[in-house]
Amino acid sequence: MTFDIYIPENLAFSDYIAVIQVARTWADAQDRKDPERFLATVAPEVTIDYSLLIPAWKSKVYTADEFVATWLAPDRVGLSVLATQHLLGMPYIKSATRDEIVVEFQEVASHGRRQDDDGAFGGKIGETADGRGWVEHRYVKIDGQWKIDLIKPSIIYMAGDWERVRRAEGAE
């Protein structure tokens, strides 16, 4: 059995750059806990499929506002003592049409629990949990702009205790 490498023949360089910019902004939005950046990246309706990573979260369709509120809540990346960095590696374009591009990125999702709880960047990290894997994004063109309408991570491995790192503030 062979693997056929997909080479998009109809992908304009400007669309490629736009998708990469949206992806980077999406990753930064999580790490900066920035709702405006998040809203700039997602379609009016976005599917989040965490079934391969955290099965209890399953796959769910959100409005853009619901997604941002959910993801920046204290039980997700909005926990003030949680420091994150989501690094996207080389993109693999799985399909490309005029109105839809599917990209799978290599991903390192680094999570650290601050020992101080002021929520400021920097500071001392006491516990960490880092995941390595891939994240698939589907981009759709809306009013001439590329937006993410599917986020589907998968994992190769996790180092550290993710559940412990993301526990509620004050919990031991």
UniProtKB/Swiss-Prot annotation:
UniProt note: phenotype after gene disruption: Impairs the hydroxylation of the flavonoid skeleton at position C3.
Record GO biological process: flavonoid biosynthetic process
Active site: H86, H111
GO molecular function, one term: lyase activity
Metabolic or biological pathway, per its Swiss-Prot or TrEMBL entry: Secondary metabolite biosynthesis; flavonoid biosynthesis
Record key words, sorted: Flavonoid biosynthesis, Lyase
Enzyme Commission number(s): 4.2.1.-
Superkingdom as given in the UniProt entry: Eukaryota
Keyword Lyase: yes
InterPro entries xref list: NTF2-like_dom_sf, Scytalone_dh
Protein family per UniProt: Belongs to the scytalone dehydratase family.
Oligomer status and interactors: Homotrimer. Each subunit contains an active site, located in the central part of the hydrophobic core of the monomer, which functions independently.
Record function comment: Cytochrome P450 monooxygenase; part of the gene cluster that mediates the biosynthesis of chlorflavonin, a fungal flavonoid with acetolactate synthase inhibitory activity. Within the pathway, cfoI is responsible for the hydroxylation of the flavonoid skeleton at position C3 with cfoF. The pathway begins with the PKS-NRPS hybrid synthetase cfoA that uses benzoic acid or p-hydroxybenzoic acid as a starter unit with four rounds of chain elongation using malonyl-CoA to form the chalcone skeleton.
The protein's name in its UniProt record: Dehydratase cfoI
Lineage: Eukaryota, Fungi, Dikarya, Ascomycota, Pezizomycotina
